[in-house]
Amino acid sequence: MSRRSKSKRVLAQPDPIYNSRLVNLLVIRVLKSGKKSVAQKIVYTALEIIAEKTNENPILLLEKAVTNVTPQVEVKARRVGGSTYQVPIEIRAYRGTNISLKWLIEFARERSGRGMASKLANEIIDAAKNAGGSIRRKEQTHKMAEANKAFAHFRY
């Protein structure tokens, strides 16, 4: 990384089928061992399942789920004078989106059932309804930040 100037962030390309950056970010997060075609198949099938189950636009439902799961604050460990404090820090929009996608996929993988596509579809539907594991993780993160509010002056 150059020391002279800050490197520019490269935005994700829009998805070829749905023409959505969010879908492409989701595909990248599902990706394992560089098999992008497999990841795309999983995500597209999940979006089709969402459309069948809810009779709504799957992209709008995905956006709603990501918005519901996105945390506003997170805690970071900060060492001050021999002890470590959990310091609450506000999250920028891009990082918030990445965290929410990561949580959606993490809790979809933990679900019971057959096929990653159906598990991902169910997790997205639950997140859009403000339920599911990813929503619990968001609430847990917010609770942690609220409990450590006293250390907010140790910001980075």
From Swiss-Prot:
Main location (coarse class): plastid
Name of protein: Small ribosomal subunit protein uS7c
Pfam families referenced in this protein's UniProt entry, alphabetically: Ribosomal_S7 (PF00177)
InterPro entries attached to this UniProt entry: Ribosomal_uS7, Ribosomal_uS7_bac/org-type, Ribosomal_uS7_CS, Ribosomal_uS7_dom, Ribosomal_uS7_dom_sf
Keywords on record: Chloroplast, Plastid, Ribonucleoprotein, Ribosomal protein, RNA-binding, rRNA-binding
Superkingdom of the source species: Eukaryota
Encoding gene (name): rps7
Originating species: Emiliania huxleyi (Coccolithophore)
GO molecular function, one term: structural constituent of ribosome
